[in-house]
């Protein structure tokens, strides 16, 4: 099987959806017999310090040109100098960074330009949902033929859950406007 590398900044054991997704993807590829090296990048992404960006570029440039390189979304979205990487790159984009709330207009414009350029640079893009694919196509001009949707999975419980009275709904996710908790609460209020 073709060996690959996966560039992930920060601590892979961080308990966020993105890190859990990437940790499971890395483990799943290895379980299928793929030789996937984990490139451990500095934790400052998506706002890399010059030192972290320099170290990341050195690690990524060391990946041979016959070994695909998967880029975490923080790296694909905020990384500069990626055109110097010889390996064919695949971007793993959970949500485009330029579309986060609370960014200054200058920061949003910078991320938009960087993400757009890097999406055009990579050979392929992995996304967790049709919504992310559609956003990349509409806003960044990404070619939908170069995008694969890899939805996150869940571990099924060993036993069926005990019935609750009244029924309970568990919504898992950071409390963030794009997660749609307001939509859920509005629907439940009806």
Regions found by a protein language model. Give the residues of each.
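N-terminal subdomain of nucleotide-sugar transferases
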Residues: 1-42, 63-67
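Conserved alpha-helical elements of sugar-nucleotide-dependent glycosyltransferases
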Residues: 17-24, 110, 183, 187
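N-terminal beta-loop-helix "entrance" segment that forms/cooperates
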Residues: 42-60
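Active-site proximal beta-strand in glycosyltransferases
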Residues: 68-70, 83-101, 126
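Short His-centered aromatic/hydrophobic patch
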Residues: 71-76
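Membrane-proximal helix-turn-helix segments that form the acceptor-binding/catalytic region
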Residues: 97, 106-127
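Conserved donor-binding/catalytic core segment of Leloir-type glycosyltransferases
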Residues: 126, 161-179, 185-189
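Carbohydrate-associated surface elements
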Residues: 131, 150-153
């Amino acid at each position: 099987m073709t060996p690959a590398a996966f560039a992930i900044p920060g601590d892979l054991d961080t308990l966020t959806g993105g890190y859990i997704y990437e940790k499971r993807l890395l483990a799943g590829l290895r379980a299928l017999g793929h030789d996937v090296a984990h490139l451990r990048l500095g934790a400052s992404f998506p706002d890399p310090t010059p030192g972290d960006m320099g170290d990341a570029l050195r690690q990524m440039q060391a990946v041979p040109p016959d070994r695909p390189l998967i880029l975490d979304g923080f790296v694909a979205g905020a990384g500069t100098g990626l055109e110097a990487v010889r390996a064919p790159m695949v971007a793993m984009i959970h949500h485009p960074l330029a579309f986060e709330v609370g960014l200054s207009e200058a920061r949003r414009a910078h991320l938009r330009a960087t993400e757009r350029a890097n999406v055009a640079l990579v050979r392929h893009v992995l996304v967790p949902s049709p919504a992310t694919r559609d956003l990349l196509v509409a806003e960044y001009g990404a070619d939908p033929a170069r995008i694969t949707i890899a939805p996150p999975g869940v571990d099924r419980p060993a036993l069926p859950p005990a019935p609750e009275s009244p029924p309970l709904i568990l919504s898992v996710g950071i409390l963030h406007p794009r997660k749609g908790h307001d939509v859920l609460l509005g629907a439940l209020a009806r």
